[in-house]
Every structure is written in structure tokens, then in C-alpha cells.
């Protein structure tokens, strides 16, 4: 397989995808980037950013549409379309991959406070499979298709735990 040579498999690992630093805000709908596949040395930062960071952008921003414009532009650029109809345009000519990453994280990215809050909310989110007084469902019998409570209906003798079919075991 041609994509499994060189640095290609590294970019597909789960650990590498989690290392992405650009987590776009919720008001970003579309993010597009124009670059050259065979750039001049001043324009190579945009191509390198797409090569190394595009998969991380897709992983961390599943609700954002990401568009690449390869070899269709004169100078490399990035453009973000926001919810309210505004556009944010970045000129990436002469910037390196790390500079582009910092620029996008600072202007379009979530702040550390927002990221920390979302992380704590995801931890505290109640699991719908949990049962008990602090959860949505009090008992397993409230789920459709499950056995009713033994308080409402007598359980079969083989389910109660008091029934032993082989008395010679003990």
C-alpha cells in the first residue's frame, strides 16, 4: 500500500491525532485552506500544515466542514466561515507550519478555560446506562424489554438464587 511508506502511517495513529492543538470554536462552520502542492520556499508552510495537521483538525473538529483548495490559488490562505455569516481570512504567505498552527489556535481556537470546562462536563455527564437514585432511571425494570421487578411479579425459582438443581455439589 503506497500510503504506508515514510511518515504516512505516523499521521494516522490515534496518539498523533490526539496531539492536535487547534480546536476550533463552536461558531466556525467551514474552514477552507488554499495552498500549492509544489510551492516556493516562502509558501511551503501552508503545504506542510495541510500534510501534518489536517488529520488532527478533522479529528478534533468533527462538526466543521474542512475544504482544501490545492493549486487553485496564487498565494496560500486560510478562510473560516462563521455562523453569523462573517468570514475570517488569513494570509499564510511566508509563514511556517508552527506559526500557522499558533495563529489559528489563537484566533479561531477555543481558550484553555473553555476546553477545561468542556472536559469537566464530559466527565460529569451522566451515563444513560447507570441506574440508581442519582441517575435518570431508578431501576432496571424501567427499561423497555427488561424483566419486571420482583416486587411486582414473582421471579422464576431458577433466577432467585435459592434454587439448586444439583444437590450433590455442596
From Swiss-Prot:
Superkingdom of this protein's organism: Eukaryota
Alphabetic keyword roster: Mitochondrion, Ribonucleoprotein, Ribosomal protein
One Pfam family it belongs to: L51_S25_CI-B8
Keyword Mitochondrion attached: yes
Subcellular localization: Mitochondrion
Main location: mitochondrion
Molecular-function annotations in GO: structural constituent of ribosome
GO CC terms in record: mitochondrial small ribosomal subunit; mitochondrion
Disulphide bridges: none
PANTHER family assigned to the protein according to its UniProt record, in alphabetical order: MITOCHONDRIAL RIBOSOMAL PROTEIN S25, SMALL RIBOSOMAL SUBUNIT PROTEIN MS25
Family assignment from sequence similarity: Belongs to the mitochondrion-specific ribosomal protein mS25 family.
Self-association state and partner proteins as the record states: Component of the mitochondrial ribosome small subunit (28S) which comprises a 12S rRNA and about 30 distinct proteins.
Protein name: Small ribosomal subunit protein mS25
The organism of origin for this protein: Caenorhabditis elegans
Gene: mrps-25
Amino acid at each position: 500500500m503506497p500510503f504506508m511508506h515514510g511518515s504516512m502511517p505516523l499521521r494516522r495513529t490515534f496518539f498523533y491525532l490526539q496531539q492536535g492543538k487547534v480546536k476550533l470554536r463552536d461558531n466556525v462552520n467551514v474552514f477552507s485552506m488554499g495552498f500549492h502542492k509544489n510551492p516556493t520556499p516562502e509558501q511551503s508552510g501552508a503545504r506542510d500544515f495541510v500534510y501534518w495537521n489536517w488529520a488532527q483538525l478533522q479529528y478534533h473538529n468533527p462538526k466543521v466542514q474542512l475544504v482544501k483548495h490545492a493549486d487553485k490559488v496564487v498565494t496560500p490562505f486560510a478562510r473560516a466561515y462563521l455562523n453569523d455569516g462573517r468570514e475570517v481570512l488569513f494570509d499564510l504567505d511566508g509563514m511556517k507550519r508552527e506559526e500557522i498552527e499558533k495563529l489559528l489556535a489563537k484566533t479561531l481556537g477555543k481558550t484553555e478555560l473553555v476546553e477545561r470546562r468542556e472536559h469537566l462536563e464530559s466527565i460529569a455527564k451522566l451515563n444513560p446506562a447507570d441506574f440508581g437514585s442519582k441517575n435518570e432511571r431508578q431501576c432496571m425494570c424501567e427499561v423497555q424489554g427488561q424483566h419486571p421487578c420482583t416486587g411486582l411479579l414473582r421471579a422464576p425459582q431458577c433466577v432467585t438464587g435459592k434454587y439448586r438443581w444439583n444437590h450433590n455439589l455442596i
